[in-house]
Every structure is written in structure tokens, then in C-alpha cells.
Amino acid sequence: MRFPRIIISSDRSNSGKTLVTAGLIKVLSKRYKVRGYKVGPDFIDPMYHKIASGHPVINLDLWLMGESGVYSSLAKYGKHFDLGIIEGVMGLYDGLYEDYSTYKLSELTHTPLILVINCSNLSSTVGAIVKGLREYRNANVRGVIFNYIASEKHLDYCKKSIPENVEVLGYLPIDKSLSVPSRHLGLYTTEDFKNAKDVINATANLIEMNVDVDKIVEIAEEANELQESNEIEERNVVGKAYVAYDSAFSFYYDENIDILKKRYDVEFFSPLNNDAPADQPSFIYIGGGYPELHLEELENSTKTKDWIKRNVEKGVKLLAECGGFMFLSNEIINEKSYRMIGLYDIQIKAKDKLTIGYTELETEKDNLLSSKGESIRGHEFHVSKAVSVGDVNFAFKNKHGKGIWNGKDGVYVENSLGSYSHFHFSRTRRLLSF
């Protein structure tokens, strides 16, 4: 299967990869049908790519999905698209180990790399960085884009430093208006950053003026052909799934929603709007996000809270990840206490030190996602913590990662499961048969 594609990488985070990727997708979407991808478990960066392309953006995470899962998703979601633009994670060789890095994904999928280098306070050293990234593991680095260029002289120094076997594809000048605000879990979500579309459009304009987009397409065409995915897309709808989505709960993998659609008709509801859908759900899914920024509204969303608790008590299946798990607790403390759903006898402190990283969980009790004895993988990403735990049952023992309490994760009541871990459903197929 022919699918031209590139990976945008760098030497570190905060290089401008996300905006450059989104701007490039926007420019290329004028001429091609472009699929955006994101290396790693991040939920927020893909939101910007989705605005640029108008299409769902697919995560490619070697820890969560495995090599075969990543390859399959790359091919499956590249079908019927002209180009793939993949944003890397952190620096080129960074990850849990190098085996889970952007470099590893480039090698696995035979996809050429383009580097975005933050040139602030650098000039000729840029060449040393590019040379080092390329030669450290003989990575397929084909080009470089300079970011945050201050002047023509600055640009000239950077250009002259680059090895001859790496194409200088262009640059973006310093423009303080082209920035996305950050907070404790990374960039603002596009739900909360209302200028996201304008910033992406302005970045795209700069790319059109200063970057050789045609050369980028030529490099993308060097990517090896992919083995076409032979996954059979069968739907066997057994009911309706309701997915919480608003500014409090917006951390979802687009592929997870696609997987749910194989078994359910999927609709969305908003706890912040106090929604209580009239139709009977077969499954409720509450993802992560920023509930700690909306505690008063969530405390007052009595219709939604009653609807969720009532349905779980009736045996409806529910999965709650991170922020969703917090919403199911007794209360969340952020200076004062805010009452939540109370399905789980747990008290949460909203703001603590950052917990971030991959998890591996040993299943001690059959649940929505896995059977006893099975190991599943996830990802933690939060600043809250449990400070009091009552009489609750845990489905998982943490082999890797922190979990909720004393090395345990996955609280269950009836057919519900609440965890600090986020999961990728491509590796939790029990969900579709439970």
C-alpha cells in the first residue's frame, strides 16, 4: 500500500513541533487529503492536528499498542488518504526506553524524519544537534525546519551549520502571537483555547511563505510501502454508548471511539451541561480531562450524577479513566470540598505533584477490560491523588506505575471500572465482548 508520510521530530519538547505539524497539515490539506498522527499517548496535541485537517487524528504508541498495533493503525487509517503527517513525542530518542521512541517508530514503519529545531539562543550549534541526532543511531533524518529565527543573519548561521546530507527546508520567524498557553497537563485543549484555529492558520501562512512544502512532499514519497491492513471492519451493534465530552472531559483517543462504534451507537453528553440522556445506555464512558477546573459546575450537575449512578446500580457497564474516575469519587478537595457522584468511597485531592508515565497492570479480578491473570498496559497523566480510601475493591495490581492506592488501580462496583490509567482499546478487546 503506497502511503507517503513523514515524521516531525526534534531534540526535545517545547521545540514547536505541535504548531509546525498543525500548520503543515493545514497547508497540505489545500492540495491533499491528509491524515494526522501523534506518536505517544498524548491527548492534547492531536486536537490541534484535527482542527488543521478536519479528520480524526490517530495515536501511534508502541507501549500501549505494540508494534503490530501501531503498524496496523498507521496502515488502516492511511487508507484512502494522500499523505500522513506524524508528530513525534519529546526528543527523537526519548520514551520509556529507546524501544518506545519516535526513532523506533520511524525504523519500524520506514518513515523519513524531518526535524524542527528551536533555534532560540543558538546558531552554528544547530548543525551539531542535527548531526548528532542523525548519526547517533543512523536515523533517517531527511530535512530540518528552523523555528524561532530572529533575523536573516541568524538564519544564515543556522543554514551554514547543517550537514550536506540534510535538506534545509525552511524556517519560521519569531512571532510571539503564535503561541499556545500551557498549564499543568500541557498545552491548553482546543476546547479552552478559543484562538486555536487562528494560531494554526497564521502558522500555516508562515509555512507557505518560508518552507519548501513541495520538497516535504517529495521526502514523504520516499517512505516504504505499507502492508495493507486486513482487519475486517464488522459492526455488531448491541446498544447505545454515551461518552462524556466537554471542557472537563475531553481526553479520548479517536481510535477508541471508532472501536466502540463496532459494538455501540455512540452519542456524547456533557456533565457540565447537566445532561441526563433519555435513552437507555448500554455503556457509559467518562474519559480524562480537567474536572479540577470545573468542580463547582460538576458538584451542581445533579441530573447527570443521578443518571450515572442510577444506571450503574442497574448494571449498565461504565468505564471511567483518570478525570472520569475522579468524578465517580465521593468528593474532590481543592481548598474546599466538592461532592461528586459517590459511586466509589474515595476522597481525592485535586492538586498534588505531577504523575506521568506508562503503567502495566496485573489483573486480579475479571473486569470490563481484562480477565484475571492477564496483564494490560496504560498511561497515567494527572496531578491529583487519592487521600482517603474506604471499603473498595481493586481489579489491578500495578507492575509498573503508581495507580490509585498502595500500588493498586481499577476500582470496580457492579459493572463499572474506574482507574487512573488511560487505556487503548486495541489491546483491551474484552471490552467489546463483556
Curated annotation (Swiss-Prot):
The active site is at C322 (nucleophile). The record marks H422 as: Increases nucleophilicity of active site Cys. It comes from the Archaea. GO terms for biological process: cobalamin biosynthetic process. Keywords: ATP-binding, Cobalamin biosynthesis, Glutamine amidotransferase, Ligase, Magnesium, Nucleotide-binding. Residues 240-430 form the GATase cobBQ-type domain. Pathway: Cofactor biosynthesis; adenosylcobalamin biosynthesis; cob(II)yrinate a,c-diamide from sirohydrochlorin (anaerobic route): step 10/10. Its cofactor is Mg(2+). Comprises of two domains. The C-terminal domain contains the binding site for glutamine and catalyzes the hydrolysis of this substrate to glutamate and ammonia. The N-terminal domain is anticipated to bind ATP and cobyrinate and catalyzes the ultimate synthesis of the diamide product. The ammonia produced via the glutaminase domain is probably translocated to the adjacent domain via a molecular tunnel, where it reacts with an activated intermediate. Its EC number is 6.3.5.11. Pfam families: CbiA, GATase_3. This is Cobyrinate a,c-diamide synthase. The a and c carboxylates of cobyrinate are activated for nucleophilic attack via formation of a phosphorylated intermediate by ATP. CbiA catalyzes first the amidation of the c-carboxylate, and then that of the a-carboxylate. Catalyzes the ATP-dependent amidation of the two carboxylate groups at positions a and c of cobyrinate, using either L-glutamine or ammonia as the nitrogen source. Belongs to the CobB/CbiA family. It catalyses: cob(II)yrinate + 2 L-glutamine + 2 ATP + 2 H2O = cob(II)yrinate a,c diamide + 2 L-glutamate + 2 ADP + 2 phosphate + 2 H(+). One of its GO terms (molecular function) is cobyrinic acid a,c-diamide synthase activity. HAMAP family: CobB_CbiA.
